From Swiss-Prot:
Protein name: Bradykinin-potentiating peptide Brachy
Species classification: Eukaryota, Metazoa, Chordata, Craniata, Vertebrata
Post-translational modification: Both amidated and non-amidated peptides have been observed in skin secretions.
Main function: The amidated peptide increases the release of nitric oxid (NO) and that NO mediates the endothelium-dependent vasodilatation. In addition, it inhibits efficiently angiotensin I-converting enzyme (ACE) in rat serum (IC(50)=8.2 uM). 3D-structure modeling of this peptide in complex with ACE suggests it acts by inhibiting the ACE C-terminal catalytic site.
Keywords: Amidation, Hypotensive agent, Secreted, Vasoactive
Species, as recorded: Brachycephalus ephippium (Pumpkin toadlet)
Proline amide: residues carrying this PTM: P8
Tissue note: Expressed by the skin gland.
Length: 8
């Protein structure tokens, strides 16, 4: 699965 989207 793709990695979780993390906002900086």
């Amino acid at each position: 699965w793709p990695p979780p989207k993390v906002s900086p």
